[in-house]
Amino acid sequence: MRXRWPAQPSKYDRLIAAARAEAPAVTIVAHPCDETSLGGAIEAAEMGLITPILVAPEAKIRNVAAEHRLDLGRREIVDVPHSHAAAAKAVALIREGRGELLMKGSLHTDELMHEVAASATGLRTQRRISHVFVMDVPGHTDTLFITDAAINIFPDLEAKRDIVQNAIDLWVAIGLGEPRVAILSAVETVTAKIPSTIEAAALCKMAERGQITGGVLEGPLAFDNAIDQEAARIKGINSPVAGHAQILVVPDLEAGNMLAKNLTFLTHADAAGLVLGARVPIVLTSRADSVRTRLASCAVAALYAARRRAAQVAAV
């Protein structure tokens, strides 16, 4: 989503710097056939965040590069006839172990995710696939996660458990410590009239019983008392999360999408995007994303891949 370069180093800049200290993540880029997607992959590679393998019609990639003066250098290109074939081949390369990350190019999100979700040939795991917005909100101290605002439309309790765990795992993997997680609803009291409040309470109990690990959960919380200390104090809510939430878990996709876009367009927040729960992290970018937001998406995914790589080495 849109943003502007700030005058001072931002939360994104710190994430990008941390990722540059790691080895580049081999990234399968599906159909980068416009200036934005191809240029973003090349710039991320030049910054040392990723090593891209470009999967698309080779002639189209070379035409885009020539038209926009993008230096392909010696980048590996896997030639396929069209965008659908690019999505299928990109997923196949991940299954073959060729890449640590999957990155969306200029094809439609649904086209890529259809291949990712395929039962026999996709990238599903036992965990539910979910999306996280990694937000840099001007004037807000912490990086802010919003989930799920792009994949799961009306998630049930079991899906929400995975959505929460995916977000916690990402927060920890990119080196931000133990997150404070707010399960959002319209109110902060449990009421049968608002089902999301009951699910919020259940998720908190699941965390108490070890069914969700790695974060501190509180809910239900309304948005104001999740992120504003004074609002939490007025409501008499005393917890480590209230007023200090770092991960916001929304009731459904509509609420999450509106929240993320409100922050983007009213506060000029940046919103990097990542899909988790598949075999590898998936970088989902929008045509409206700024260069820095695209780099931040790659950086977060690369940090996640680096932590997984380190864990695999330690396990040997």
Swiss-Prot record:
UniProt feature coiled coil, ranges: none
Pfam family, one: PTA_PTB
GO cellular component, one term: cytoplasm
GO molecular function: phosphate acetyltransferase activity
Main subcellular location: cytoplasm
InterPro entries in the record: P_Ac_Bu_trans (IPR012147), Phos_Acetyltrans/Butyryltrans (IPR050500), PTA_PTB (IPR002505)
Catalytic reaction(s) noted: acetyl-CoA + phosphate = acetyl phosphate + CoA
The protein's name: Phosphate acetyltransferase
Enzyme class: transferase
Alphabetical keyword list: Acyltransferase, Cytoplasm, Transferase
Biological process per Gene Ontology, one example term: acetyl-CoA biosynthetic process
Record-listed E.C. numbers: 2.3.1.8
Pathway annotation: Metabolic intermediate biosynthesis; acetyl-CoA biosynthesis; acetyl-CoA from acetate: step 2/2
Sequence similarity: Belongs to the phosphate acetyltransferase and butyryltransferase family.
Presence of keyword Acyltransferase: yes
Location(s) in or outside the cell: Cytoplasm
